[in-house]
Amino acid sequence: MLILLSCAKTMSDVSKTKTPLTTFPGFRKEAAEVALQMSQFSVEELERLLKVNPKIAVENYRRYQAFHSEGTRELPALLAYTGIVFKRVHPQDFSEEDFCYAQDHLRLTSFCYGVLRPLDMIRPYRLEGDVRLPEPGNRTMFDYWKPILTDRFIADIKKVGGVLCNLASDEMRGLFDWKRVEKEVRVITPEFHVWKNGKLATVVVYTKMSRGEMTRYILKNRIESVEQLKTFAWEGFEFNEQLSDETKYVFTNGKTE
């Protein structure tokens, strides 16, 4: 089973956690080109393109200016992203065996790097999927990456059993030819819902936390089969057979109001 997670907007370049090894990103040449083009934008342009405030725009202007410098700090991708999902994965207490297992069974999307393995060394950046690069052809990041990533992604899934546990946000499907992915491998997309006023609702923060917790559960327990995936339980969330089907695994908090 391969897990797909979305990258986070927040990143760090410092960590005390040691990993058994580090690797180069599979698409580092493309990432360098993406970053080079992003470095041509002014602070004001980045503020508009990334939809951020001036402070964050300045921070990322500096990041892109330093992206190609030898002294720029790097971290393994799983330690570099610091959003809610990654806090719940909590790789800081992973064993060497956990990291090695994750390297084969987890992939992280990235608008700058394409797709990353957990131990791929990356530099801080911020990028959105609808940003258009001048070259080639003024394409969005989705259109840029789709023909590059799809074959490699499908091959990675097939290497570990042909099942994808899709814990990424919906927009990340745009980085791949998703119809091809669904045709060539089995895709299961877990959903997490809570009862609110007698109806099931999606609470973004719970969804993010649950995605991180499920990722941790799969990696720590070496979950390989779809049946084992159904055993995930956290903070009252449990597998709901009635609401689930072959492609959508629904987990609810089990409290009908």
UniProtKB/Swiss-Prot annotation:
Pfam families: H2O2_YaaD. InterPro entries: YaaA (IPR005583). GO terms for cellular component: cytosol. Belongs to the UPF0246 family. This is UPF0246 protein BF4021. The lineage of its organism: Bacteria, Pseudomonadati, Bacteroidota, Bacteroidia, Bacteroidales. GO terms for biological process: response to hydroperoxide. It comes from the Bacteria. HAMAP family: UPF0246. It comes from Bacteroides fragilis (strain YCH46).
